[in-house]
Amino acid sequence: MASLIYRQLLTNSYTVELSDEINTIGSEKSQNVTINPGPFAQTNYAPVVLESWEVNDSTTIEPVLDGPYQPTSFKPPSDYWILLNPTNQQVVLEGTNKTDIWVALLLVEPNVTNQSRQYTLFGETKQITVENNTNKWKFFEMFRSSVSAEFQHKRTLTSDTKLAGFLKFYNSVWTFYGETPHATTDYSSTSNLSEVETAIHVEFYIIPRSQESKCNEYINTGLPPMQNTRNIVPVALSSRSVTYQRAQVNEDIIISKTSLWKEMQYNRDIIIRFKFNNSIVKLGGLGYKWPEISFKAANYQYNYLRDGEQVMAHTTCSVNGENNYSYNGGLLPTHFSVSRYEVIKENSYVYDNYWDDSQAFRNMVYVRSLAANLNSVKCSGGNYNFQMPVGAWPVMSGGAVSLHFAGVTLSTEFTDFVSLNSLRFRFSLTVEEPPFSILRTRVSGLYGLPAFNPNNGHEYYEIAGRFSFILLVPSNDDYQTPIMNSVTVRQDLERQLGDLREEFNSLSQEIAMTQLIDLALLPLDMFSMFSGIKSTIDAAKSMATMVMKKFKKSGLATSISELTRSLSNAASSVSRSSSIKSNISSISVWTDVSEQITGSSDSVRNISTQTSAISKRLRLREITTQTEGMNFIDISAAVLKTKIDKSTHISPDTLPDIITESSEKFLPKRAYRVLKDDEVMEVDVDGKFFAYKVDTFEEVPFDVDKFVDLVTDSPVISAIIDFKTLKNLNDNYGITRSQALDLIRSDPRVLRDFINQNNPIIKNRIEQLILQCRL
């Protein structure tokens, strides 16, 4: 089972980097599947996500990879990559605006000596010298800037995927150059981009520029496996303009019904209109200083027609994860300065709360199966004049981001008169051209959307899409469920969680590092520690239930469960008695602590025992066997337990959220290793992998086949002391083979000996791991 996971990396079905597989294992369950689609054209994939039920479609969601299309001549739109997929044609593409740009892509097969070939370019016969002494294909980009000039060789793309790209964007045409898998883009400027027309002589795909990262991936690593099959039939480009008859998708479906309640599924089209708001503060005095320019929440109310129904909608737009910039022109009172201005970019999010007066939102209290699909939108910044008393005004201009749908949750909006349950749509951001700058200052070439003039004169930005959810509503349509009974309102709990996170992180400076190291070196795990948390003994029963319930749904638990389900079957020959023994010892340690607490009843101890019993099973399935060694969960649990003991306001409601969050976020930089004889093979979550000898710590070539076999048949060990630390320790202090093996196995006794000897290298490594534990 386990070998299947890794052997798929080596088959022809698909190709991924080892880092991709490691990230997948550490985050969520995903699987690439190659499907034989049959003799049908795969031009337009259905723009819908299928769950246990389907979100019906009436609004087109733009596909990432649209095609393949037959060779044709047309004027491609701006902001779309043309992904060219030739077979053996010599001339791949010709593009010109007949004024200042003529560009042609020529395909040259591998192993061609220097020779002159005859090509027909733009109706003219040309002799061009080509050469390809590699085993890959080469795309020669030929260029001229006037009709009377000769073609010059401008760029070369050396490719083993035999794919090329062409894009019209921002007064330039863009192509790929370099060598795969590290090819990148470059451009040629033109004064008349809109008139550039192309003659494409090969099959091609169309990809939105917002998905340029996927285009880059295809160029460098090849098309997805579904596209590399003879059953994919190219169609004419005109198929993109086929008019489809709109189906009825704004519908109400009764899922189930009793005498008092019924379940209704609402499928709706949606148009979200929103705008940004900002706050610009100017200091008094001479009038040259601006202390703050920031984003503020913005409300917008509008009407639109949904399938013949007039809908009044309300949105509230807010931003999160703003980046603070500043500009200081000098120290004098007459020097222009902005102390802080906010910019949103890739690490930011935009939230849109949406509510309308339709039947779907009337009883939106008990909700399940919520799903949505939305298009993307580009938001461009405008100009803002800093009006100063004397001198030329600095002008902020430019900046743009694209918003991409990243999720939807339920929310509650409060006004002075009413509280409304609404949908909160979350959008991730990518930066776009042009960059922003402040005229007459040195601020230029920065990317993102600043808070100066984010709407750029637009009354609103608009996003179209659809959503669907199932509500439990009264059978009597005239009755409205009281909003105060809503199960979606969690403001108080969120506030407690926020306060608790801040308290946890501030406690880090107050906890002695030696105390944490001693605790981390005990055989401990995330669940058996509960019996030793003094502040939660009285609430052990409800707390244990809630923690297990929440952890079961966490991303870490899901990935561990899926991974170990396959690995444990394959590694059945590995003895697990040592791991069980480790768990029993850890349970006894913390049970002793709990028994010292006065006033704890037998029933509480029984609950603690039950929780510890559950932990035995979870510990066995953490990643694979640990063979008497310490793992990353031990350190996480030690830090968490120490902080919980010192925390002042732990409650049974907030603890499960903190436990679950810490298990997923603590120690993000992890590494794992397998050991065979005198050779160690180590991989980390960043995708780095290497092998080395135990005796000399000399690196040896990383054998993927051997790694596959070892993962199948051997325990996977947490690399508490990583290779870099081991090498440093050996170079500076010298360690025996026995010590090296114990450190590689993360033996707690040996680690404690090194720390008791005040070894700075080992101690520093443990401290670095503990310092990663932040919420």
From Swiss-Prot:
Covalent S-S links between cysteines: C317-C379
One cellular-component annotation, GO: host cytoskeleton
Motif (YGL motif): 447-449
Motif (DGE motif): 307-309
This protein's UniProt keywords: Capsid protein, Coiled coil, Disulfide bond, Hemagglutinin, Host cell membrane, Host cytoplasm, Host cytoskeleton, Host endoplasmic reticulum, Host membrane, Host-virus interaction, Membrane, Outer capsid protein, Viral attachment to host cell, Viral penetration into host cytoplasm, Viral penetration via permeabilization of host membrane, Virion, Virus entry into host cell
Coiled-coil region(s): 483-515
InterPro entries according to UniProt: ConA-like_dom_sf, Rota_A_VP4, Rota_VP4_MID, Rota_VP4_MID_sf, VP4_concanavalin-like, VP4_helical
Site features described as Cleavage, chain residue numbers: R230, N231, R240, S241, R246, A247
Spike foot as annotated region, ranges: 509-775
Region (Hydrophobic): 388-408
Region Spike head: start-end pairs: 65-223
Signal sequence annotation: none
Region (Spike body and stalk (antigen domain)): 247-478
Motif annotated as KID motif, chain positions: 643-645
One annotated GO biological process: virion attachment to host cell
HAMAP family: Rota_A_VP4, Rota_VP4
Family from the record: Belongs to the rotavirus VP4 family.
Additional detail: This strain probably does not use sialic acid to attach to the host cell. In group A rotaviruses, VP4 defines the P serotype.
Protein name per the record: Outer capsid protein VP4
